[in-house]
């Protein structure tokens, strides 16, 4: 953009019609829950993790992603479709899908259902660190998940971890 074009563009904007103050949204536009901001963080977010459709679907998308459980054939469009049909309400529902559930959906079929179920079956063998990452726990990325998994090699050991044990892990707490 040339200097003249920029000057013309900015001089034609009438500031008189601009609202004097931006009104930041206070509620989630999807579910209506009051937005919150954690101390020390800049972002406001919806805390309704189990009732806000975009959050539920986003968690599922993260869970099935390549670096997490690597479930092929279950991308955002398919998650949207299965969520809208009531077949996916949470991550656990992925492991309850049947050949019939998938095959009867528009744009899917027997072959898609077979491939998706095979990929879901393979996902049951991913390393514990990837499962931990796939859960989408705030502030637990791939590296932190690996560190936690090294310290607590099973979910049984992790569930009994004390706060002191967890915070003694580098990058945790």
Q: Residue spans of the language-model regions?
A:
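Charged catalytic and DNA/RNA-contacting regions of genome-maintenance
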Residues: 1
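Accessory alpha-helical DNA-binding modules that contact the DNA backbone or grooves
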Residues: 4-172
């Amino acid at each position: 953009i040339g200097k003249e074009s920029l000057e013309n563009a900015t001089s034609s904007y009438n500031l008189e019609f601009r609202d004097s103050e931006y009104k930041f949204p206070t509620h989630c536009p999807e579910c209506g829950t009051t937005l919150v901001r954690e101390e020390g963080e800049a972002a406001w977010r919806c805390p309704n993790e189990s009732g806000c459709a975009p959050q539920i679907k986003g968690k599922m998308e993260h869970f099935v992603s390549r670096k997490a459980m690597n479930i092929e054939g279950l991308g955002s469009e398919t998650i949207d479709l299965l969520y809208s049909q009531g077949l996916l309400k949470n991550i656990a529902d992925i492991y309850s899908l049947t050949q019939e559930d998938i095959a009867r959906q528009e744009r899917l079929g027997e072959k898609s259902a077979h491939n998706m179920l095979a990929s879901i079956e393979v996902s049951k063998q991913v390393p514990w660190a990837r499962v931990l990452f796939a859960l989408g726990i705030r502030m637990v990325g791939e590296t932190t998940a690996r560190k936690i998994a090294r310290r607590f090699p099973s979910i049984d050991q992790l569930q009994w971890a004390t706060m002191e044990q967890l915070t003694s892990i580098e990058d945790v707490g």
